[in-house]
Amino acid sequence: LFGMGPALAAVAMAVNAEIPVDVIRHTLKTFKGVEHRIEFVREVHGVRFINDSKGTNVDSTLKAIATMDRPTTIILGGSTKHSDYAPLAKAMVESPYIEGAVVIGATTPEITPALDAAGFTDYRLETDFKQAVVAAQSMTRRGGNVLLSPACASFDMFSCFEERGDTFKQIVNELQ
């Protein structure tokens, strides 16, 4: 579970500060998580949409992939940080849950060779963000996830990762 480490650290600090256990329990049960970080948006026709727009580098996206527990289509790409996408492509091939990808943005020429070299072939290229979300939905079977975790900065299409995440949520909330 993503965030388990920080949650356990918070519990330890709360216990050390002598916060009542019932208050700690209530806080853990009601905490909704951090916006744009493995954030559940909505389920549409049996497909769950997860916003990880904060996944602006390969390491963050690897961590997001590790939290997936059902068939997942990932949306990758954005503006370049001149990253090595080989570890990401390898993790996608090795993951029992990453079944497809939609690649968008200025980093498409950097990401697709890494996917090809790793043998990850179930991906589509899109140039429009909304179309990328729609394509990911169409690639994902009922009971699966669409994960926006780009492994890239957002500056080719958006002013910041928050704008990208908010746009993702808006598109998802408009899906029928």
Region annotations inferred by a language model:
Residues 17, 54, 122-125, 157:
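A structural signal for short, well-ordered beta-strand elements
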Residues 82, 108-111, 153-156:
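Short, active-site-adjacent cap segments at secondary-structure transitions
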Residues 23, 60, 110-113, 157:
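Phosphate- and divalent-cation-binding pockets in alpha/beta enzyme and binding domains
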Residues 21, 58, 85, 108, ...:
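Residues at or immediately preceding the N-termini of alpha-helices
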Residues 86-144:
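C-terminal helical cap/extension that packs against the catalytic core
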Residues 151-176:
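Glycine/aspartate-rich loop-and-adjacent alpha/beta segment that forms the canonical ThDP
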Residues 76, 147-151:
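Short beta-strands and strand-loop turn motifs
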Residues 1-98:
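Nucleotide phosphate-binding/pyrophosphate-handling subdomain across enzymes
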